């Protein structure tokens, strides 16, 4: 999570975070800051999916071009979020992929896909969510999770739905 000057939020001492929530994550990264903001919204009484949406809205006020893609799970829900600040893969990412001989895959950098899972009777029983790294063909049931959308799945029933942030 970085601002327009490329300064990571971890180095931005002026960004107002709840130190208690941040320290409870055990981390010192931008992901720990993101998670601590989510924890604050949960403490305010929001359900996990809405806490994630609120956290992205808040963080985007300072860092609108950052990517907030994540997967987070509670006892009741799995939330998988696609929230990239840029639609196009940055030249630096393409450069890095090229260095490893994988330049043709750079277009897939921020893409998230999901596939519904059914039980033996054909009833919905869950969802698989994945990022890049292996083939996820539409012919195999994979669907693109659009930018600024999240999958919200019940850990108890496997039922899921897509919602916007």
What are these regions (language model features)?
Residues 2-165:
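N-terminal segments that mediate ammonia production and transfer
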């Amino acid at each position: 999570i970085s601002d327009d000057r490329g300064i990571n939020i971890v180095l931005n001492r002026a960004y107002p975070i709840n130190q208690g929530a941040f320290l409870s994550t055990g981390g010192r990264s931008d992901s720990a800051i993101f998670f601590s903001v989510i924890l604050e919204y949960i403490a305010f009484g929001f359900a996990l999916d809405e806490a994630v949406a609120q956290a992205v809205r808040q963080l985007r006020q300072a860092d609108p071009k950052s990517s907030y893609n994540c997967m987070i799970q509670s006892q009741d829900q799995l939330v998988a979020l696609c929230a990239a600040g840029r639609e196009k893969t940055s030249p630096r990412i393409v450069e890095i992929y090229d260095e490893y001989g994988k330049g043709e895959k750079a277009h897939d950098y921020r893409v998230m896909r999901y596939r519904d899972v059914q039980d033996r009777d054909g009833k919905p029983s869950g969802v698989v969510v994945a990022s890049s790294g292996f083939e996820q063909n539409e012919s195999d049931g994979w669907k693109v999770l659009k930018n600024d959308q999240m999958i919200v799945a019940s850990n108890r029933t496997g039922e899921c739905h897509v919602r916007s942030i």
